Amino acid sequence: MCIRDSNTSIPELTELGKQYIITDYDIHDDGRIYTDNFQKLIDLVYNAGGGVIVIPHGTYMTGALFFRQGVNLYIEDDATLMGSDDISDYPVCETRIEGETCQYFTALINASGIDGFTLCGNGTIDGNGLRSWKAFWQRRTWNPDCTNKDEQRARLIYMSGCTNVTVAGLHICNSQFWTNHLYRCCLLYTSDA
C-alpha cells in the first residue's frame, strides 16, 4: 500500500533522534567510495539505539548500504549521496526483481523489515546511472531481445516488508535501474520527493 499524504513535510532533524554527521566518521567529499565507512556508521547508530545519519554539503560516494531498525537518513541542502557506477560495489543477494525472487544486485539504499524509516532533507540521492544506461542501450542494439536483468545494474532504493516509511523533500535521480522499488511495504508517506 502506498499513501501519498499532502500533510507530510520534511521532519525536523531533532525529531529523528541523535545526529551522526558523516564527516565525523571518516567519510569525505573527495570522490572516493566510502561504502565500508557508511555501513559501519549505520551499524554504530543501530547499536547505539538509533538516530539519524546526516549528510552535509558536498557529494559523498558509496556502494550498497543496508539500513537497520531505528537508523534514519537526512540529506542537507546542497548535499548529495552519490552511488558508485561500478556494479561490483553492489553485492548479489536474494531479492525481488521483475516479479520473481532471485539472486540479483542490491540497491544503493536497502531496507528490509524496518518499522519507522525516514529518508528526508532537501538534498539529492543520485544513482550515477549514465554508465549503466549507455551499456543497456548498447546491448539492446545488438540484442533487441535482451531483458532488463541482462545488463547488470543496481536499483536506487529497495525496501522490502517495511512499514511507516517517510520519504520527504529529496531529489531522487539518475538511477541505474529502477528508482524506487517498494515490495510488500505499507504506510508509506511521501512529500515532494
Where does each model-flagged region fall?
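Conserved small/polar residues in nucleotide/adenosyl-binding loops
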Residues: M1-S6, Y189-A193
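All-beta strand scaffolds that present successive hydrophobic residues in beta-strands
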Residues: L73-E76, F117-G121, V165-A168, L187-S191
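Acidic/polar low-complexity surface segments
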Residues: G83-Q103, D126-R153, S191
